[in-house]
């Protein structure tokens, strides 16, 4: 966190936070002291929470509008997998929470929605998430986060598209037609999963940001 203005020699100089809002890597809570360092402090980037809520709502709306075809194996469970970019990044935390809140799979941890990766959750017994439910056309469907992980490569780079492409290969081998939705904290990882598996299997894939 930034120190208070009175304690810093450059306290009156303009400060710009770019792309990443200062926040707790554990909870995703914004560091308001840093964001209000002085009267010329600015943040240039996304509104993490608003965008996250929109992504979650888009996924939920898609399921409801395509309920006749979305459940690929007809088991009454809408299963999704989630590529998490960086477990300590506030945008990634917000986007994971946004998906889980919209689909009813969120559980609380220390007063906030738990954004930890679930690993695998084939039977719905994970404690990081819970089974959600959606009622559409008089029928109730279970919504389950089948798997999620942080996409970090062996060199330590997060938000890694290649890792996401490998992950969807592993998940599809494990879950097959239980996977009805693929979701990602960003477009790069989402496109990697789409090209590696979703496209050929006609599984809707949701990303986030502005890759061309």
Question: Can you describe what each PLM-predicted range is?
Answer:
Residues 1-212:
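A residue-level marker of the well-folded mature domains of exported/periplasmic proteins
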């Amino acid at each position: 966190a930034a120190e208070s203005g009175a304690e810093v020699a450059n306290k009156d100089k303009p400060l710009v936070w770019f792309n990443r809002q200062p926040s707790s890597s554990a909870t995703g809570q914004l560091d308001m002291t840093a964001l209000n360092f002085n009267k010329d402090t600015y943040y240039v980037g996304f509104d993490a929470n608003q965008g996250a809520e929109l992504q979650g709502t888009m996924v939920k709306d898609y399921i409801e509008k395509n309920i006749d075809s979305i459940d690929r194996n007809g088991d009454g469970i809408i299963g999704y997998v989630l590529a998490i970019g960086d477990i300590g990044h506030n945008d990634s935390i917000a986007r994971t929470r946004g998906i889980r809140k919209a689909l009813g799979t969120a559980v609380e941890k220390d007063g906030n929605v738990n954004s930890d990766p679930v690993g695998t959750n084939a039977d719905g017994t994970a404690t990081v998430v819970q089974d959600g439910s959606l009622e559409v056309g008089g029928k109730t469907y279970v919504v389950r986060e089948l798997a999620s992980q942080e996409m970090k490569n062996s060199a330590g780079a997060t938000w890694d598209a290649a890792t996401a492409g490998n992950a969807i290969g592993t998940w599809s081998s494990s879950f097959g037609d239980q996977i009805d939705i693929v979701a990602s904290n960003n477009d790069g990882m989402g496109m990697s999963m789409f090209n590696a598996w979703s496209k050929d299997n006609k599984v809707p894939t949701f990303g986030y940001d502005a890759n061309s």
